[in-house]
């Protein structure tokens, strides 16, 4: 499902508190294009849940992951994948061929995610190219993200590609690759973060992967997020093949 087209036919997807949205396969994922918004505002007693049909019929378990795609927000905030002089026309393709992102609007607004859970996502769209639970690609600081959980994603829990978006109250549990990942000039803030690796899954990887830009280490803006009040609970595996480190 795509909300709007790239900088055209802008739309806002509104999801009511207590709603459950489910995907049937890896081809099912939600993309909010540049210029459009999502308004997913749940509550502590009525969160909005994005999950798989397997979860709905009770066949998901503690090791389930990758049963549907995930959520991708595409914004118009800066990324160092584009030169500063060309930010206004920046157009970078997001992971999973989800669409273009980037621009010269650091305060860009892609909507609201509040009291939202994302479970059992991260399908491998093409070989070695999985979707994250939530992908923030060029998402601006006008976007509100508060009380977000990503559970049992087969790739990263959340990943930031450039942008300036802030996140508060972030819970990342049982994700198989990095729980919190950023690259390409993300300069947002994260506060109140809990990361817990699945103690029974050898595929659990690092809690954090932090990059600037893989092809140009000195690219600006340099990735420089601020993180406060974080707890990381790693695994206790001792085999050489297992990743037991918190970071």
Tell what function each PLM region has.
Residues 1-247:
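Beta-strand/loop edge motif enriched in small/polar residues
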């Amino acid at each position: 499902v795509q909300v709007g087209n790239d900088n055209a036919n802008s739309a806002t997807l509104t999801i009511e508190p207590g709603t459950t949205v489910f995907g049937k396969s890896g081809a099912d994922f939600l993309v909010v294009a540049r210029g459009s918004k999502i308004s997913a505002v749940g509550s502590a007693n009525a969160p909005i849940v994005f999950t798989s049909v397997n979860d709905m019929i009770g066949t998901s378990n503690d090791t389930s992951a990758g049963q549907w795609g995930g959520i991708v927000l595409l914004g118009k905030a800066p990324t160092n994948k584009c030169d500063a002089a060309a930010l206004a026309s920046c157009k970078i393709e997001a992971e999973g061929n989800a669409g273009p992102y980037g621009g010269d609007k650091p305060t860009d607004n892609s909507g609201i995610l509040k009291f939202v859970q994302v479970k059992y996502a991260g399908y491998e769209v093409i070989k070695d190219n999985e979707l994250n639970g939530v992908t923030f690609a060029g998402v601006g600081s006008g976007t509100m993200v508060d009380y977000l959980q990503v559970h049992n994603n087969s790739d990263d829990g959340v990943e930031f590609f450039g942008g300036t978006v802030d996140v508060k109250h972030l819970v990342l549990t049982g994700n198989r690759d990095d729980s919190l990942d950023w690259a390409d000039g993300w300069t947002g803030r994260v506060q109140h973060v809990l990361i817990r690796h699945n103690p029974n899954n050898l595929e659990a990887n690092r809690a954090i992967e932090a990059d600037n830009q893989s092809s140009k280490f000195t690219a600006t803006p340099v990735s420089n997020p601020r993180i406060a009040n974080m707890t990381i609970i790693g695994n206790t595996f001792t085999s050489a093949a297992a990743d037991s480190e918190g970071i």
